[in-house]
Amino acid sequence: MASNLPLQLPAGVSDLLPPEAAALRQLEQRLLNCFRSWGYQEVMTPTFEFATTFQAGSPAGEEGALYKFIDRQGRVLALRPEMTAPIARLVATSLRRRELPLRLGYSARVFRYEEPQAGRRREFHQAGVELIGAGGVAGDVEIIALAVESLAQAGLEDFRLGLGQVAVTKGVLQDLALPPEAVAGIKSALASKDLVALERIYDEYHLEGERRRRLELLATIHGGREALEEARACFGRTAAAASLAELSRVWEALGAAGLEKWLFIDLGILRDFDYYTGIVFEGYVPGLGAPVCGGGRYDGLLAQFGYPCPATGFALGLERLLLARGETAPASLAGGYLVAGRDLAALLKRARELRSKGTAVVLDGESRSRQEAAARAAARGLNLEWIGE
C-alpha cells in the first residue's frame, strides 16, 4: 500500500547519519570534559519556554527568528534560540541563593527561524559556559582563556579569537550625539563590516573630520598590541576611554599567560544580542566565513529576571566546529566483535561477557556458517567469534 507520509524534511533541518552523529557526540563530550576541568557544572533547561524569556535583551528583529506556538491555555511559548537567557532565568529562580560566582556549562539543541548558513541550520547544536557573578577583568580573562582551550580541545589548530568592547562603541556614539536611527544604522554597519553603508551614514548626517575618523577607526582597527595603541591614541579622551583601558588590561593578562598568539583586536565586533555590555569576542578559522565561537559580558541581563548580577560567557557551534575540522569520526565499531552461531543463549552469554569488558558486540544468530558470519564481520569491520560447530 502506498504511503502518504512525507519523505522530505522541512527546510533548515537535517538527519545525522552514524559518522556525523558519532563525530558530534565525541566533540560534545570533549567540550563538556573541558568545561568540567575548569569547574563548570552542567545544567539543562527546557527545549521550550514562555516566549518572553527569549525576548529579554534581544533586538526587535530577533523576535522574528523565534519558533513560536500557543499552548492550550493560550500562552505563547517558543523553542529556545540560544542558551544564555534560559540560564539567566534558571539562575534568577533556582540558584539565586547559591554562593557566587557560579560556573555553569551546557550542551543543547537550539532553534532559529533564519536563513541557513554554513555549518548552522535552523536547528543546530551549541555547547558553552556562563560565569555568573564575576565582574571585571578577572572574569573576562577566565572566559576568553577557556574559549581558547575549548577550541584547541575541539581539534582546531589554526584559529583566532577577535576581541572587542561594545562599551567603546557606545562611548563613541554617545559623544557623537546622533539620533537613534543613525545609531542603529552604524551598529548594523559595524557588525557586518559594511563600509559602504557607513559612507552613506557619514554623508546623511554630515559626519566629518574627527567625528568621521573615530567611526572609521571603529570599523577598521584590527590587529594586536599596535591596534590597542592606535585605539588609545584616538579614543583616550572620549567616553570610551575607561572601557578601552579595561580591554587593554584583559589583553595584557592574556598575553602574560601566553595566549596572545591566538588573539587579535577588532572593535567592530558587536555580537548579535543587545544584552552585551562589555568585552565581546568571536572565534574564526580560515576558510569558514562565520564564527565558530562567540560570547562576551552581559551585566544587565539577569536584572531583567529580578536578579542584578554581572555575567559573561560564550557558546560554540558544534556543526561549525566539525565543518572547520573537515572530518568526521569513524562510524564503524572498530575493535568490536560479531558473535555468531546458532545457540542464541550461548551468544547472549558470551556477548554479555565481552560487553562487561567495554567491548562493542553485535549478535548474529542468522548466519548459517562460519564463512557467512566471517563475511558479515568483515563488512562491518568487526572481529568474529563463532560459537558452535
Swiss-Prot record:
TM stretches of this protein: none
GO molecular function: catalytic activity, acting on a protein; histidine-tRNA ligase activity; transferase activity
Involved pathway(s): Amino-acid biosynthesis; L-histidine biosynthesis; L-histidine from 5-phospho-alpha-D-ribose 1-diphosphate: step 1/9
Record CDD domains: HisRS-like_core
Cellular compartment(s): Cytoplasm
GO terms of biological process kind: histidyl-tRNA aminoacylation; L-histidine biosynthetic process
Main localization of the protein described in the UniProt heading: cytoplasm
A GO CC annotation given for this chain: cytoplasm
Keywords noted in UniProt: Amino-acid biosynthesis, Cytoplasm, Histidine biosynthesis
InterPro entries xrefs: aa-tRNA-synth_II, aa-tRNA-synth_II/BPL/LPL, HisRS-like_core, HisRS/HisZ, HisZ
Keyword Secreted: no
Other notes: This function is generally fulfilled by the C-terminal part of HisG, which is missing in some bacteria such as this one.
Primary role: Required for the first step of histidine biosynthesis. May allow the feedback regulation of ATP phosphoribosyltransferase activity by histidine.
Quaternary structure annotation from Swiss-Prot or TrEMBL: Heteromultimer composed of HisG and HisZ subunits.
Family, similarity comment: Belongs to the class-II aminoacyl-tRNA synthetase family. HisZ subfamily.
Database matches in NCBIfam families: hisZ_biosyn_reg
Descriptive protein name: ATP phosphoribosyltransferase regulatory subunit
Organism: Moorella thermoacetica (strain ATCC 39073 / JCM 9320)
Classification lineage: Bacteria, Bacillati, Bacillota, Clostridia, Moorellales
